[in-house]
A protein has these predicted regions:
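Ligand-binding loop in jelly-roll beta-barrel domains
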Residues: 78-100
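Glycine- and acidic-residue-biased ligand/ion/polar-headgroup-sensing regions
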Residues: 46-57
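Short acidic-glycine-tyrosine-enriched beta hairpin
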Residues: 63-78
Length: 100
């Protein structure tokens, strides 16, 4: 059994990010964003998967916008430009390789 305290919490206005697992090469984060928060498009540092726990976001990958709702999952590749706009207060888990 592995138990990890929610450590390395990062709070920025409109966004709350907590690392819930890391083994040095892979990590999982829980991210909460407030309605109206915009994260500008940026290249993905690694292949990643995102699972939306609650809320609704507009996620942009390579210029294409998609509405993502609670219980949706999708993945994207290292280097892909991605960003989001929170349409509601939302919470998601993102899992990714730390080093590729």
């Amino acid at each position: 059994m592995f138990i990890n305290k929610l450590s390395q919490e990062v709070k920025i206005s409109g966004i709350d990010k907590k690392q819930i697992y890391s083994n040095g090469t892979f990590e999982s984060l829980v991210v909460a964003v407030e309605k109206g928060m915009v994260v500008p498009a940026q290249p993905a540092p690694a292949d990643a998967g995102l699972y939306l726990i609650s809320g609704k976001i507009e996620f942009e990958i390579a210029g294409k916008k998609t509405c993502v709702e609670a219980d949706d999952f999708f993945s994207f590749s290292k280097g892909e430009l991605h960003g989001l706009t929170a349409l509601e207060n939302s919470k998601f888990i993102i899992s990714r390789n730390v080093f590729e």
